[in-house]
């Protein structure tokens, strides 16, 4: 009964939590080739009443992924500076991404452990208006990616860039963190930023100032450590510190020539003095070659084996034949040597020679006295009288 009373409130709390995590749905309309920015605000996920501000100490983190996949699509990125700051989903869709995509976002409250889900329905379509064939990319070293994503800094950058470009409408095409391009993480010093690449497009041609900055002469000066060729006033300073040595201009007004599609031929090469086709070789039977390769070494080995056996077994003289061929004087001399050797060995084994006195036990080298082996050694003085 006690266990039932314990589990009932717990199940009620879990069911209430599941009810809180019911996914909200929002429909967005990204455009192909244009930057898309969606802010993940704490107010949206906390579901606070109206006119109630978000507590400054709240900690919320987000996890976003494509529905049915563990990660985001390749054109979409996510960033959040800290749990106190909002998160951002940003990127630029490509023509291959055109269509419908569903992004699932889960918010985690690190203080109360509440979980809230949101479903973003992205209907990716083509942009309206004129094409933007003139595109320029700038490296801004004074900002991080999440500092440029809000609409206010982005509009300020486009307005400042208008002083360097021909009159015309400028549109933001893409924003990429410098860390995603191989940049280094800055030191934790005040004023150091990661850097961000900002890509801008326009229907108006590039100005002379921008063409001079992106010219080969300007890049050569940058490679030598000199300032680039900037003939106009830098209207982006001091709010945006642009690295003018990393400016890229892309002109898509001139269509690129289409790749030639190779046409299949008849398979017959034209006359070429450097190409000598191989002649047709008739069919050959390699059975004879294989037999010769295998049998000839075997026959040679067999003949050598028979010859060696004949020499070792049939050509031996034998002891009797060898003794008959040896003279009697030589045989007597040989037997005498063996007999004398045996006699010397017997004499050496039977001789009795007294052992040297120095090797006998209890022998005094000074007096020459020798004690019997059974004398009590405890009664013998350590130092004998020397006469």
Swiss-Prot record:
InterPro entries: Cadg, Cadherin-like_sf, Sarcoglycan_alpha/epsilon, Sarcoglycan_C, Sarcoglycan_N. It is found in: Cell membrane, Sarcolemma; Cytoplasm, Cytoskeleton. GO terms for cellular component: cell-cell junction; cytoskeleton; dystrophin-associated glycoprotein complex; endoplasmic reticulum membrane; Golgi membrane; membrane raft; plasma membrane; sarcoglycan complex. Keywords: Cell membrane, Cytoplasm, Cytoskeleton, Disease variant, Glycoprotein, Limb-girdle muscular dystrophy, Membrane, Phosphoprotein, Signal, Transmembrane, Transmembrane helix. Most strongly expressed in skeletal muscle. Also expressed in cardiac muscle and, at much lower levels, in lung. In the fetus, most abundant in cardiac muscle and, at lower levels, in lung. Also detected in liver and kidney. Not expressed in brain. It comes from the Eukaryota. Residues 312-387 are cytoplasmic. Glycans are attached at residues 174, 246. The chain crosses the membrane at residues 291-311. GO terms for biological process: muscle contraction; muscle organ development. GO terms for molecular function: calcium ion binding. Disulfide bonds: none annotated. The keyword Lyase does not apply. It is a single-pass type I membrane protein. It holds the Pfam family Sarcoglycan_2_C. Residues 1-23 form the signal peptide. Interacts with the syntrophin SNTA1. Cross-link to form 2 major subcomplexes: one consisting of SGCB, SGCD and SGCG and the other consisting of SGCB and SGCD. The association between SGCB and SGCG is particularly strong while SGCA is loosely associated with the other sarcoglycans. Belongs to the sarcoglycan alpha/epsilon family. This is Alpha-sarcoglycan. The gene is SGCA.
């Amino acid at each position: 009964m006690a266990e039932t009373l314990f589990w009932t409130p717990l199940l009620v709390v879990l069911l209430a939590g599941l009810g809180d995590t019911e996914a909200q749905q929002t429909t967005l309309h990204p455009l192909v080739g244009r930057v898309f920015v969606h802010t993940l605000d704490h107010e949206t996920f906390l579901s606070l009443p109206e006119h109630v501000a978000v507590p400054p100490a709240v900690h919320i983190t987000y996890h976003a992924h494509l529905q049915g996949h563990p990660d985001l699509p390749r054109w979409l990125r996510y960033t959040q500076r800290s749990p106190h700051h909002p998160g951002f989903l940003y990127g630029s869709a490509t023509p291959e991404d055109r269509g419908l995509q569903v992004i699932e976002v889960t918010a985690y409250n690190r203080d109360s452990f509440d979980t809230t889900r949101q479903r973003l329905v992205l209907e990716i379509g083509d942009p309206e208006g004129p094409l933007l064939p003139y595109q320029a990319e700038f490296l801004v070293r004074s900002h991080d990616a999440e500092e440029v994503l809000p609409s206010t800094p982005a509009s300020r950058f486009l307005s400042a860039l208008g002083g360097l470009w021909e009159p015309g409408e400028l549109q933001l095409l893409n924003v990429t963190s410098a860390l995603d391009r191989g940049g280094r993480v800055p030191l934790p010093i005040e004023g150091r930023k990661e850097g961000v690449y900002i890509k801008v497009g326009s229907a108006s041609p590039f100005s002379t100032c921008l063409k001079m900055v992106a010219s080969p002469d300007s890049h050569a000066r940058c490679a030598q450590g000199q300032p680039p060729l900037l003939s106009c006033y830098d209207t982006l300073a001091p709010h945006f510190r642009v690295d003018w040595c990393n400016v890229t201009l892309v002109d898509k007004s001139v269509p690129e020539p289409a790749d030639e599609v190779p046409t299949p031929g008849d398979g017959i090469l034209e006359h070429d003095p450097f190409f000598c086709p191989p002649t047709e070789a008739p069919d050959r039977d390699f059975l004879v070659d294989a037999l010769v390769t295998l049998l000839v070494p075997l026959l040679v080995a067999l003949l050598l084996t028979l010859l060696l056996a004949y020499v070792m077994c049939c050509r031996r003289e034998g002891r009797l034949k060898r003794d008959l061929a040896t003279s009697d004087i030589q045989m007597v001399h040989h037997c005498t040597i063996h007999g004398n050797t045996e006699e010397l060995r017997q004499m050496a084994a039977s001789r009795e020679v007294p052992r040297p006195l120095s090797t006998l036990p209890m022998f005094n080298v000074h007096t020459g006295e020798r004690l019997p082996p059974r004398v009590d050694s405890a009664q013998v003085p350590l130092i004998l009288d020397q006469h």
